Amino acid sequence: MNPVTREQRDEAIAHFKYEGTLVKDCPYGSGHINDTFLLIFEIAEMGRIKVILQRMNSTAFPKPVEVMENITGVTSFLKKKIIENGGDPERETLNVIPAVDGKPYYIDSTGDYWRSYKFITDASTYDLVEKPEQFYESAVAFGNFQSLLSDYPAETLHETIEKFHDTRNRFALFKKSVEEDVMGRAASVEKEIRFVLEREEIANCFAEMLDRHELPLRVTPVSYTHLTLPTK
């Protein structure tokens, strides 16, 4: 995708339901798929609030409308569960800021898709685990997410990236890549390739269990934006 222009960003900002006066906007985070910006607004008597504005990568996610339908469906479900459990839905799940037309996304004049979320303050994200405690807390969060969504109708989610979690298809593509060896690098990783090929049966087991209806569909943090993933 082409770099985001100042004009594009201004257009997107003008088409979301923001309150207050914009005092700052700048690129944010270390993500490499979508283009993310932090916006800071000044609101009388409330001080400054932060929101996230993001241009969605339609190359990586070719069905952005379905992506946002998945997100709004799951986050709405989560909010109800979090409130029932006495939690704080402003901090414990994403909160989508709608566009001025009420949709959870905006399409700019160039055809790019944008979305916006409330910024979660006093929170940290990590590209790499720095200590065991961080890994533990991520597992706790993952488990809590799974628990809250255990009765979510996962079959209602759109599969916006075809066969993304189909391990049989992934393995077939891997073997095809090894055979073609377009870049001539297979010989340098023969040990690693052999390690993977010897475990093809393991790679297929979840898909086969799903085919036999032995494994229910579930939503996961890495997949609810675009598809369902079989997991216990």
Regions found by a protein language model. Name each.
Residues 39-44:
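Active-site beta-strand termini and strand-to-loop segments that position acidic
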Residues 36-38, 116, 219:
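Conserved hydrophobic/aromatic beta-strand scaffold that supports enzyme active sites
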Residues 70-74:
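The N-lobe alphaC helix and its flanking beta3-alphaC-beta4 segment of protein kinase-like domains
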Residues 55, 61-65, 120-138, 151-222:
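ATP-dependent phospho-/nucleotidyl transfer catalytic cores
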